[in-house]
Amino acid sequence: MKGDDLFSEALKLFPSGVNSPVRFYRPVPVMFERGRGSRIYDVNGKEYIDYSLGFGPMILGHADPDVASAIKRQADNGILFGSITENEVRLGNIIKNHVKSIEKMRFTNSGTEATMHAIRLARGYTKRKYILKMEGGFHGAHDYALIKSGSGTMTFGVPSSNGVPEEITKTVLVGKYNDENSIESLFNEYGNDIAAVITEPILGNIGVINPEPGFLEFLREITNKYNSLLIFDEVITGFRFAFSGYQDIINIKPDITTMGKIIGGGAPIGLFGSSSEIMDLISPSGNVYESGTFSGNPLSMAAGIAAMEKLQGMDYSRINNYTADLVKSLYDIFNDKNIDVNINHYGSMFQIFFNKNEVKTYDDAIKSDKDRFFKFFKKMLDHNVYLPPSQFETNFVSFAHGRDDLNKTIEAAKEAVSCI
């Protein structure tokens, strides 16, 4: 098989044969070469319905013609100039006009960069030491984020990462998502030196875990009380459920917002944004340093504008309803076979936890049956449905998914469940 041979070559070039850990699974990861709409195709020509969507960015589906044309036009006009461009202004205005908490922003090349700079900015603004993150919350692969993190660090049983200095871990406090007492106790002890709380408003790298009623409001209240900043990491949730941030849906205004994924139309991108007062601390107007050769690069800006202009006219209820219908059908299938699952979802995000109990916290999530999940993943793969290959990632639905995809996914799930 061509894919097996290529992966053998990849193993000689890249650690575990991949360039990001969660892409690896045994015996051999599928090697893809193209996509169109809701479908992706491997190097052997096999077609799959895709619910990974590049881990979230491809909300319009693969090879969207408007996004592809925008990238091609920009490539013909130049790939990198090392200076400000009109398209940076255009994309920045789209985001500013639809995310109320953002007055100014900086584009970066990834969500990792965005959260890294947001944390530095919060410390620079408050002149405080500690960052408080949530257990299982994932904010990228920089040192300050890799402490009791989610995503691949959970998939492979690594609590954080070797190579992160103890001096850094001592500046990061870890609270429990959906546990107000946990957060309050940390503020009682360290509150006057907590620069910021950073959280995904919906945890999306530990599967999907929704906030309990009042929890995010509590975070806003306690950070205000202690003059700490609240950072919402909306790299996943930004423009996923509506043409806005999730913060605008729930009407909670963070002090700093990070975004990525969808706003780049599938091209590499991230951003962090805040009030003018806070953002003006960024160099060269202030003394909090941030830079990047490829930040705001023309290809990503062109892709982002095309994607966002198209998204602005889309009816989000379509993908939200598709997801709700799929989740209901999956519950029926699992219940019919007396298999205990909890399927957490919001909007067009969902994840299946092989767990008889509700999953509301990190502790709940890690009790899920990872082996059974992987068996289900493999059987779905055998039936031409590609899910993210980890119990602790998230499935996504795109505007390219339609009734035929839904029906085929349900039939595949019926076959898969009978084998696990």
UniProtKB/Swiss-Prot annotation:
Compartments, record wording: Cytoplasm
Any Pfam family: Aminotran_3
Pathway assigned to this chain's UniProt record: Porphyrin-containing compound metabolism; protoporphyrin-IX biosynthesis; 5-aminolevulinate from L-glutamyl-tRNA(Glu): step 2/2
Enzyme class of the recorded protein, top EC level: isomerase
Protein name in the entry: Glutamate-1-semialdehyde 2,1-aminomutase
Record flagged with keyword Cytoplasm: yes
PROSITE patterns attached to this UniProt entry: AA_TRANSFER_CLASS_3 (PS00600)
Main subcellular location of this protein, as a coarse class: cytoplasm
Cofactor(s) recorded in Swiss-Prot or TrEMBL: pyridoxal 5'-phosphate
Substrates-to-products reaction catalysed: (S)-4-amino-5-oxopentanoate = 5-aminolevulinate
UniProt key word Isomerase: yes
Keyword list, A-Z: Cytoplasm, Isomerase, Porphyrin biosynthesis, Pyridoxal phosphate
CDD domains: OAT_like
